[in-house]
Amino acid sequence: MNAIFRWPFARSLSRVRGIGMTASVIAFSNVNAQPATVPSSTEKAAVDALIPWLLQEDAQLRGIPFSEVIFDSTGKHVLACNPKDETNARVLKQMSSVLDEVMARLNAPESPIQGIPRINEVSSHFEDLIRELLNKTPGLACDFPKTATGGKQRSGYPDLELVDQLSHRVYYLDPKLYAVGSRDSSFRTFYFEPKIATNKVREDAVHFIVGFEHEKPAADRQWKFTRWDLVDLSHFQVKLKAEFQGSNRDMYRPEAIVATSGKGPE
């Protein structure tokens, strides 16, 4: 079924950038791999308007305040972290002790991450240990955020939700691992995909990236992490990359195959 979704950041961009039109993103899904249907006149008009707009407004899709992306897609505010605030100062001190211990434990020769070949496979160990140690810290509670439907989900932003039980203040944490020398890289390392049912940002909160820097692994695959940083995302700016996607199911449709060496459908 074809569906038209209003672009959640159109209002924000119109206000901030002065864009004089409302954009709509067209999502075509062929979940049941049924024969393609002819788009309605409304859908075609939306596509015809969207493509030229994307081509002309590329520069306008950069430097978008992440706080506005979150508010427009979830209705929740990204709060700035003032380190001089009494509650923030206390929580930051507790978090700093935890992150020091996380790095020390995972750098140890007997750490479960030692010998893991790919850094992507290491990330979950950081999430689990951060969660474990924060939960052992008096006055703090940390867990995987619940989605709008009430379930817990590890994938997607943010990874962890920390609650200060005295003030009931919420902090969202998203651990990131990066190699020494790559702090200034322009390669994409962060993404946020607005969702409804699986939205995990359900509170006004401080949003933190928890960055861990690591040396390039030696031949013996020993990981060594050298520093951590807590990054406040209240002034973070993002850009939108518009792309049209399709799956193998969408491509390899029987009616679209005009020649093959195969003997028949799999």
Regions found by a protein language model. Give the residues of each.
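Conserved catalytic cores of phosphodiester-cleaving nucleases, focusing on short active-site segments
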Residues: L160-L162, Y171-A179
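Interdomain/boundary linker segments immediately adjacent to catalytic/signaling cores
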Residues: P35-L129
